[in-house]
Amino acid sequence: MDFFRNQFFIGFSINFILIYIFCKIPLMTKGGWISAGILGTILWGCLSWQGWMSVVIYLLFGSLVTKIGFKFKKEQGIAEKRGGRRGPENVWGSAATGLFLAIMTKFNAANIVMFKVGFAASFAAKLADTFGSEIGKRFGEETYLITSLQKVERGTEGGISIEGTLASILGSIFMAFIMLRLSIISTKYHFIIVVVSGFLATLSESIIGAKFQNKYKLSNELVNAIQTCLLYTSDAADDC
C-alpha cells in the first residue's frame, strides 16, 4: 500500500491519465506531452500537487498567450513554429532550472526556502518572457534593441517594446501570485523577490539575445536555460 501512496506514483498516474484525455488539444506536440508528463511526475513527487499545479498553470497560460494574434504573427513571419505548439525542447528549456531546484528540496532541507523561491522565480521569469515576447510581437507599436535603443523590426532577438515590457511585468506578477496562493512561497518579501527577479530575468534574456544569440547561433531554448540559471544564481546570492 505504501507504493500506491508514494507521491511519485500518484504524480505519474494523474499526469498520464490527464495527458491521455487532453493530448488531442493542440497545445503541445506528442513529444511535448510526454515531456510534460515526466516533468509533472517529478514535480508532484518533490513539491506535491502545489508544485505540479503551478507549472500546469504556467504551461497553460504560456501556450494560450502564444495563440494571441497568431494569424498576424504568422503573416509577419515571427510566429512560433508548429502553430505555437510546445515541443520537448520548449518544455525542458524553460523548466530545467526549476526542475533541478524542485529536486534539491528533497536533498537539502536546510535550504528548502531558498530552493522554493528560486523555483518560483524561474517560472515567473519564463511566463514574463513569454507574455512580453508574444504580446510585444502582436501589439508592440515600436520595437527597440535593448542594448542600443535603435529601432528594429518586430521579432528581432533582443528587441523590446513598451507593450511587451508591460506584459512581462504582468506575467511576472501573475506567476508570483500563483506561487504565493499555492504556498510555494509564503511571505510578501519572497513575492517581491520573485516579481522583480522574474522581470529582470526577461531583460537579461533580451540582452543575451541582442549580443550573442545570432552571433553564436544560440537556440531560444539554450538562451532560456541560461536565463533561468542566471536568475537562480542571483536569487541565491540575495538569500545568503
Question: What does each model-identified segment do?
Answer:
Residues 232-240:
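Single conserved hydrophobic/aromatic residue that forms the stacking wall/gate
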Residues 2-55, 59-176, 189-231:
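Interhelical loop and helix-boundary elements at the membrane-water interface
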Residues 182-188:
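Membrane-interfacial helix-loop-helix connectors in multipass membrane proteins
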Residues 105, 183, 238-239:
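Residue-level marker of positions within ordered structural domains that often coincide
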